[in-house]
Amino acid sequence: MNAKEFLIELLKFKSVTPNDDGALNFIAMELSDFEAFFIEKEGIKNLLLTKKFKDEGEHLAFGGHVDVVPAGEGWSNNAFAPVEKEGFIYARGAQDMKSGVAAFVDAAKNADFKGARLSLILTSDEEGEAIYGTKAVLEWMQERDMLPDYAVVAEPTCVKKIGDSIKIGRRGSINGKLLIRGKQGHVAYPEKCINPVHDFAPVLKLLAGFDLDPGSAEFSPSKIVITDIRGGMGVCNVTPNDLKLMFNVRNSPDTSLEDVKSYVEKICHGLNYELELKQSSEAFLTNIDNKIVQKMNESVQKITHEVPELNTKGGTSDARYFAKYGVKVVEFGVCNDRIHAIDERVSIEEFEKLCLVFKDLIENF
C-alpha cells in the first residue's frame, strides 16, 4: 500500500494510551525486511525495527508513538474511522503523531540508505506516563551496544506550514508543591490566629511569574508559573489552617532543580513551610552545527522551500530520552494546530511532503 493508504489504516487502530490495539504488529508487517524486536515492560508494548546495511558507518534512528489521547465527545465523525475531506484526513492521531510514524515507515521502506544501520523506535506509552516506552527501548539497545548515533522524533513541530519549525531541544519541567502552615481560628480574633494567606501574600509577588534566568538564544527564561492555590474551608468566619500552592517551571539548562529550591527557600524565609520539588523531564539541546541538525535543515528546505526556525519551544517529548542516552536528536513533523483537539486532522499535502523530507534525509545522510 502507498503512504496515504498506510496512514489511513494506522489511524483505524483505537490505540488510546497505553494500548497499541495491534498497531505495532501492523507496522512490523509493513517493514518485514527489518528485524523486529517487541520489547515489553510493565505491560507497555514497544517495537524496535532495525536493519543493518554494512559493518562500518553511522546509525540513524526515527522515533515515534502510536498511542493517542482519548477522543472525547463532539466529533463530526467516529474519531477512529478516518474521513478524507477537502485535502485533509480527519481522525484521532492524524497530527499527533500517526502521520509522523507513517511518514518515516514509508521513507524507511523506499529510501536508499548509505549508512550502517537504520532503526525505527516505536512505543504505545508517550501520551501517558511515558516511563516504560522509548526509555525502555533505549535501555534495551544500550545493553546490546545498539544505540543510534542520531535520531529524528517525528512529533508535529510545525506551526503555520510544513517546514517552518525544527525542534533542536526542549525545556525541562520541574513541578513544585508549597505548603504554608498557619493556625486556624475565629476571624473576629485575628490576633489569636496565624493566617497563612496573610503571611504568604507579600511572597506571592516574588514567586508568580519570576524568571529564574534571563533566557538565551535557544531558550526562553525559566519562569515560575503558579498552577493552583487554595486555603481555608470555604467559609467567611474561619481563618485557614494552611495554604497550598502548586507551580511549574519549564527550565532551560541554565536553571536546575537546586536553583529553584534555593530561590523559593530564600523568599519563604521566616515562614513555616514545606517545599516539594520534582524534575519530571530534563532540558536538552542539540548544537546547531551537529550533523543531524544540518541534514534535517537541508532536507526540509529542499522539499518544502521553507527556512525552518530552529527552536526549543513547546512542551516535552520522548526526544529527551534520546538526548539522555547521548543520541543527537531533532524533532520534525506536520503542523500541530489540532493536536489533542476535536476533529483532529492532517493535511494530505503536508503528510506527503513529510514523507519526502524523511526519504531525502535518509538518502543524503
From Swiss-Prot:
InterPro entries: ArgE/DapE_CS, Bact_exopeptidase_dim_dom, DapE_proteobac, Peptidase_M20, Peptidase_M20_dimer, Peptidase_M20A
BP term (GO), one: diaminopimelate biosynthetic process
Source organism, top-level taxon: Bacteria
Pathway entry: Amino-acid biosynthesis; L-lysine biosynthesis via DAP pathway; LL-2,6-diaminopimelate from (S)-tetrahydrodipicolinate (succinylase route): step 3/3
Binding site for Zn(2+) 1: H65, D96, E155
Cofactor: binding comment: Binds 2 Zn(2+) or Co(2+) ions per subunit.
GO molecular function annotation: acetylornithine deacetylase activity; metal ion binding; succinyl-diaminopimelate desuccinylase activity
EC number(s) given by UniProt: 3.5.1.18
Name of the top EC class for this enzyme: hydrolase
PROSITE patterns to which the protein is assigned, alphabetical: ARGE_DAPE_CPG2_1, ARGE_DAPE_CPG2_2
Chain residues that bind Zn(2+) 2: D96, E127, H340
Entries under SUPFAM superfamilies matching the protein: Bacterial exopeptidase dimerisation domain, Zn-dependent exopeptidases
Cross-referenced Pfam families: M20_dimer, Peptidase_M20
Binding partners and assembly: Homodimer.
HAMAP family recorded: DapE
Function: Catalyzes the hydrolysis of N-succinyl-L,L-diaminopimelic acid (SDAP), forming succinate and LL-2,6-diaminopimelate (DAP), an intermediate involved in the bacterial biosynthesis of lysine and meso-diaminopimelic acid, an essential component of bacterial cell walls.
Protein name, per record: Succinyl-diaminopimelate desuccinylase
Source organism (scientific name): Campylobacter jejuni subsp. jejuni serotype O:2 (strain ATCC 700819 / NCTC 11168)
